[in-house]
Amino acid sequence: MAVDPPKADPKGVAVDSSRRCPALGSREDQSAKAGGCCGSRDRVRRCIRANLLVLLTVAAVVAGVGLGLGVSAAGGADALGPARLTRFAFPGELLLRLLKMIILPLVVCSLIGGAASLDPSALGRVGAWALLFFLVTTLLASALGVGLALALKPGAAVTAITSINDSVVDPCARSAPTKEALDSFLDLVRNIFPSNLVSAAFRSFATSYEPKDNSCKIPQSCIQREINSTMVQLLCEVEGMNILGLVVFAIVFGVALRKLGPEGELLIRFFNSFNDATMVLVSWIMWYAPVGILFLVASKIVEMKDVRQLFISLGKYILCCLLGHAIHGLLVLPLIYFLFTRKNPYRFLWGIMTPLATAFGTSSSSATLPLMMKCVEEKNGVAKHISRFILPIGATVNMDGAALFQCVAAVFIAQLNGVSLDFVKIITILVTATASSVGAAGIPAGGVLTLAIILEAVSLPVKDISLILAVDWLVDRSCTVLNVEGDAFGAGLLQSYVDRTKMPSSEPELIQVKNEVSLNPLPLATEEGNPLLKQYQGPTGDSSATFEKESVM
């Protein structure tokens, strides 16, 4: 016998609802009234928390400029003295040392893991597209620099300047002739194939010329070749990491490990685990970056003896360089990115704001590389096997800012000396600047070292480089920002290309090595999911799959 459920008392329901509704209504009314205020506060708080590091870094740059100008107004370097100035710059020096400490393991391990995660055919396509992008953007930057310099005529505004910063130039370097373009090309090839990998971590090869009667000390390790009765060619190893040779070796070594098949999987996992641990160190260093950047910028401004007179004398040249970098970085590169990806380029730029500010503070593409890798992966969604393969290459060969600055400087020096540039000389400047920027080291003032090649190519006096050195502390920072921005946009474009073409990659297995992956014992050669084996499902899609080892030949 079915029992009817008890009926609810309508009065009780009415009473309960009358008791509850006012309270509920009051909460809704209160939340509606306070939602606009509290909700906006919460959004602002979350936004600040998510972008705290970016805001701190940008604020550090602004504070560094203000602090430097304030100390300069109070007497500057003369009032501080050499000892106090060194202590004043110590926090910035510490940041540079921390970043440079990370470069070597990061470049080698990331490139080995990235090259091992792509098939050789995919590796070739990605590398070819990257080099094409870097070449096109460098040519565009060079053309923009020449066009702006011809339009603004910065050299015509400079009068009665003979040696604004002679103290910066080494007196021994003034009398030495400049090496030829062929010597620079041969040095580039020598650095691609280092004779010693250990020494390549801190030394690179360079050719120079010295007079026979030069009183400057010549290192005993240099190979001397007599050119004529007055000149000697020196083949020496100079201080500075040979990052180009390390990049080439790491890529080739990664390809070789992939060709080994399962035998090389343990070593691939080792390099990927090493790289992941290095990125943890990078995340810690990033929180010290604002402090170091503040003192790097401030100390560099304090070192300049007369900033005001410098800007008055070379203001048009500085404006030409900074305007060119701004146009290329805020219009040209974002436009290329938008045309190929149909994504908002300025949202991409906001994601790499911390590395850009770090590049301005450190003035080194190589030192910014660890932070750039972390930001493009976490903020902009670039896959690890793309960023860790492309960004080290870009830090070596992609120098948009250097190419633009060199073209502006060449036209500036030509106008300063009253030399007219015809069409052939302009093309020579474009081609030489693009080619020489590839070999420019990713170190502070690396572009100035290759500027002499361009001046020699169009028969302009090399001695006027001393004018460029006077303001290089500012222009070189702008160059570095543009260089690393071009690297990041290149990684973003290649990520879009890989997504569209569905390029095969073993990245999830090889790059993202998690703790749950068992390293001992190693998976058998027939284990499912081995990225170095090709799996063929049976006709019915069952588990009876066959595996075939990838050929080493």
From Swiss-Prot:
Residues 1-50, 116-129, 261-269, 341-345, 377-385, 495-553 are cytoplasmic. Down-regulated at acidic pH, with the exception of L-glutamate transport which is up-regulated instead. The gene is Slc1a5. This is Neutral amino acid transporter B(0). Induction: Up-regulated during differentiation of preadipocytes into adipocytes upon treatment with a combination of glucocorticoids and INS. Gene3D superfamilies: Sodium:dicarboxylate symporter (1.10.3860.10). The chain crosses the membrane at residues 51-80, 94-115, 130-152, 237-260, 270-297, 319-340, 386-412, 473-494. Coiled coil: none annotated. One of its GO terms (molecular function) is L-aspartate transmembrane transporter activity.
